[in-house]
Amino acid sequence: MLKMNLANLQLFAHKKGGGSTSNGRDSQAKRLGAKAADGQTVSGGSILYRQRGTHIYPGVNVGRGGDDTLFAKVEGVVRFERKGRDKKQVSVYPVAK
């Protein structure tokens, strides 16, 4: 009896298959930035500016939340101002009735 050597023949693809790309993802926009304009009248508790970190600092009658959001403490008119040479702040000045 003749013994035959059977080769273990495996065929591989010569092109990678049409798999999914490793891109194609993005995070949701966080809607940061100014929520009230300079000169606008706002009520107490209104959000003035949403931010990460302190791009803008709180001024008169403005508080800073845990996520650095700036909000009005009293009803009044919003003013964006300079704070020194290279910083900005937002203040709320009450209007006389």
Swiss-Prot record:
Keywords assigned: Ribonucleoprotein, Ribosomal protein
GO cellular component, one term: cytosolic large ribosomal subunit
Modification after translation (UniProt): The N-terminus is cleaved by ribosomal processing cysteine protease Prp.
Region (Disordered): 14-37
Propeptide segments, given as residue ranges: 1-12
Keyword ATP-binding assigned: no
InterPro entries the record matches: Ribosomal_bL27, Ribosomal_bL27_CS
Domain of life: Bacteria
Family: Belongs to the bacterial ribosomal protein bL27 family.
UniProt cross-references to HAMAP family, sorted A to Z: Ribosomal_bL27
Protein name (record): Large ribosomal subunit protein bL27
Species the sequence originates in: Streptococcus pyogenes serotype M1
Name of the gene encoding the protein in the UniProt record: rpmA
